[in-house]
């Protein structure tokens, strides 16, 4: 069983997917975290965070590094790097690198292989999860929220290291890039359950999703 969660950056996908995993006993995977790790790999081999690296060079660097994840933790060469990939420098570049078709193919293949060779149930979140990676998943969700709310959430997560104006501007740019991607663009897929999380708490959102999920299972019996 796969529950696929899609939506824009900072709409609550990771937090909600983690919590749903706990409540339902499903394993959690974030494709966004994988793209962030790849962006970290690129940054480690660049002199300046304002520079970018070619797709071919980055593909080779990925092969030279070990990316892994388990129990909701994400590793680069055996080191838990979650604290290193949630910052403004990664935010600034991750959309650029995730637009490379070759990079998306690597991440999508890795996600599909994990599910294919496992008997576990999964909650997988990320942009294009419901449209490209797992379009036939049993339950598809699209989480959304206003830019102002998303900026405020990220501001609280980052302990005020960036201003609300900076975060809002970054998110608007990110949305524009994600919606214009030739491959894996941000969009609603057919049959998705749309939920605006702007003024809802974590527990409220999870309860709404679980209720909808259970109702769907009853109807399909």
Swiss-Prot record:
Coiled-coil segments on the chain, per record: none
Encoding gene per record: cmk1
UniProt-annotated binding residues for ATP: 7-15
UniProt superkingdom: Bacteria
Catalytic reaction annotation: CMP + ATP = CDP + ADP; dCMP + ATP = dCDP + ADP
Transmembrane segments: none
Entry similarity comment: Belongs to the cytidylate kinase family. Type 1 subfamily.
Full protein name: Cytidylate kinase 1
Span of the signal peptide: none
This protein's record includes keyword Kinase: yes
């Amino acid at each position: 069983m796969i529950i696929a969660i899609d939506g824009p950056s900072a709409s609550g996908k990771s937090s909600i997917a983690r919590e749903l995993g706990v409540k339902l006993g499903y394993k959690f995977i974030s494709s966004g975290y994988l793209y962030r790790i790849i962006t970290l790999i690129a940054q480690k081999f660049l002199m300046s965070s304002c520079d970018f690296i070619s797709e071919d060079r980055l593909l080779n660097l990925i092969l030279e590094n070990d990316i892994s994840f388990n129990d909701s933790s994400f590793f680069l060469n055996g080191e838990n790097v979650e604290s290193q990939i949630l910052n403004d420098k990664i935010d600034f570049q991750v959309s650029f690198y995730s637009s490379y078709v070759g990079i998306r193919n690597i991440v999508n293949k890795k996600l599909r292989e994990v599910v294919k060779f496992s008997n576990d149930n999964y909650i997988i979140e990320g942009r294009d999860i419901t449209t490209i990676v797992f379009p036939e998943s049993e339950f598809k969700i699209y989480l959304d929220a206003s830019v102002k709310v998303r900026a405020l959430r990220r501001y609280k997560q980052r302990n005020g290291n960036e201003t609300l104006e900076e975060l809002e501007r970054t998110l608007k740019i990110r949305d524009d890039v994600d919606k214009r991607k030739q491959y894996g663009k941000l969009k609603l897929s057919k049959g998705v359950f749309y939920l605006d999380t702007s003024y809802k708490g974590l527990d409220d959102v999870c309860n709404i999703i679980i209720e909808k999920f259970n109702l769907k299972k009853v109807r399909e019996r």
